[in-house]
């Protein structure tokens, strides 16, 4: 398939988005994952089938339109669960795997979750949180489902859902939702003593995805490495935007396996935070110096200033060995959450790996502004997304002030905190 093939998804809800992709690209890989040492491709059709089976099982368990929490490492089972919740009309509550038992219990109580899915590693934390007893509070009546490890429930649940569908159940298939219905509750890591529960609708998320699809260049042939935590809006929407674009996502095996995973999965897009991206760039130069190639690389960099050598294609040709060291296919790095060093952004772009920055927050689902490959400026976060209006209020003599943003990606509000919501949403 041509590298340049793009797909703009017009879905108004996450369920509609997934159905549209499956209808047009049923056989394209939605995910790749390792199974028994081999890489397996999961097509969009297979993904939807598994999501429908699991979502139907949730209806069979009385959880079809409830709030359901998820905690665990980034994984394909994690995302299956997420999609089965939100595409069935429920609300997903992704939770930070770094929570203490007390923090986890608090978020479960505040969110109103009726069940929680956890992986094997975090089951002890979940059980500890549920066992906590606080004076004057009732015990939490929450169902616990294991996603991975011994006694994992997903395989059994998918069989239950499949049989229910064969028996005539259409509960999940028929589940209706409006664009303004809540889809996700995300807890901010926050600067206050208690994190806020941000309510995001299908419209919030899908409008941001559509903006990014029009503004950036995502291709059907792309392979996105999902490294950022899925309980963060940047990590979660970072996978959803590639799914909406009919591209593939993979999950990193861990920090020390990034280089290996980039190569074996054929990763073309990496979404990360500055510290990680800067470390990747430092390692490139460490290897250049170790191999005694500094002079040749500097000569190559001088060539890229000549008009005939400025194209991305030519830069990648000149620095093909560096590209090979980054897995051989990496073409785009998207960075957010904090400022990226100008030297790093410029350096990676000079090597032919387009590196862009964005700015946003959980409350805006999350992107407010971003660079695009046609409009790069090291040190900048680019321009506002197409559907956003952004102004700087109360500017000082240096032009620094408060960023005020308006658009369809602005949250529904903070859960059960009307005063806090009113303080930040004025229109």
Q: Which role fits each region the language model picked out?
A:
Residues 17-19, 87-160, 172:
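Structural core segment of the AMP-binding/adenylate-forming
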Residues 4-12, 153-182:
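Flexible, low-complexity linker/hinge segments
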Residues 270, 314-427:
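Conserved AMP-binding/adenylate-forming
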Residues 26-29, 164-187, 194, 217-223:
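Conserved pre-ATP/AMP-binding loop-to-beta segment of ANL
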Residues 30-62, 66-75, 79-83, 100-109, ...:
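Conserved AMP-binding/adenylate-forming core of the ANL superfamily
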Residues 69-71, 78, 82, 86-117, ...:
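Short beta-strand->loop structural element characteristic of the AMP-binding/adenylate-forming
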Residues 206-223, 230-319, 329:
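Conserved AMP-binding/adenylation subdomain of ANL enzymes
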Residues 41-45, 183-209:
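Conserved AMP-binding A3 loop
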């Amino acid at each position: 398939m041509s590298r340049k093939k793009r797909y703009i998804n017009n879905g108004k809800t996450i369920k509609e988005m997934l159905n549209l992709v499956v209808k047009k690209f049923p056989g394209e890989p939605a995910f790749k994952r390792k199974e028994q040492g081999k890489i397996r491709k999961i097509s969009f059709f297979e993904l939807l089938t598994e999501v429908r089976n699991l979502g139907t099982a949730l209806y069979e368990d009385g959880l079809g339109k409830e709030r359901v929490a998820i905690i665990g490492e980034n994984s394909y089972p994690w995302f299956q669960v997420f999609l089965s919740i939100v595409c069935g009309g429920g609300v997903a509550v992704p939770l930070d795997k770094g929570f203490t038992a007390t923090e986890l219990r608090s978020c479960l109580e505040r969110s109103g979750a009726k069940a929680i899915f956890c992986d094997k590693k975090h089951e002890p934390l979940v059980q500890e949180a549920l066992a906590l007893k606080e004076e004057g509070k009732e015990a939490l009546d929450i169902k616990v489902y294991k996603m991975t490890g011994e006694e994992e429930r997903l395989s059994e649940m998918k069989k239950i859902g499949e049989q229910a569908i064969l028996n005539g159940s259409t509960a999940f298939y028929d589940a209706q939702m409006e664009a303004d219905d809540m889809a996700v509750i995300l807890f901010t890591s926050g600067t206050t003593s208690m994190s806020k529960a941000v309510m995001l609708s299908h419209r919030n998320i899908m409008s941001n995805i559509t903006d990014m699809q029009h503004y950036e260049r995502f291709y059907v042939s792309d392979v996105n490495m999902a490294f950022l935590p899925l309980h963060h809006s940047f990590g979660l929407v970072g996978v959803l935007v590639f799914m909406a674009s009919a591209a593939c996502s993979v999950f990193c095996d861990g920090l020390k396996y990034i280089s290996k995973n980039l190569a074996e999965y054929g990763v073309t897009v990496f979404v990360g935070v500055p510290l990680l991206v800067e470390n990747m760039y430092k390692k490139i130069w460490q290897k250049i110096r170790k191999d005694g190639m500094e002079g040749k690389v500097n000569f190559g960099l001088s060539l890229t200033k000549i008009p005939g050598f400025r194209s991305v294609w030519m830069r990648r040709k000149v620095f093909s060995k560096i590209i090979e060291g980054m897995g051989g296919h990496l073409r785009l790095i998207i960075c957010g959450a904090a400022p990226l060093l100008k030297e790093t952004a410029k350096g990676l772009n000079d090597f032919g790996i387009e590196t862009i920055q964005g700015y946003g927050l959980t409350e805006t689902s999350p992107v407010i502004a971003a660079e695009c490959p046609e409009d790069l400026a090291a040190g900048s976060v680019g321009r506002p997304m197409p559907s956003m209006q952004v102004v700087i209020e109360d500017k000082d003599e240096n032009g620094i002030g408060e960023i005020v943003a308006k658009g369809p990606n602005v949250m529904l509000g903070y859960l059960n905190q009307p005063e806090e919501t009113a303080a930040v949403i004025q229109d």
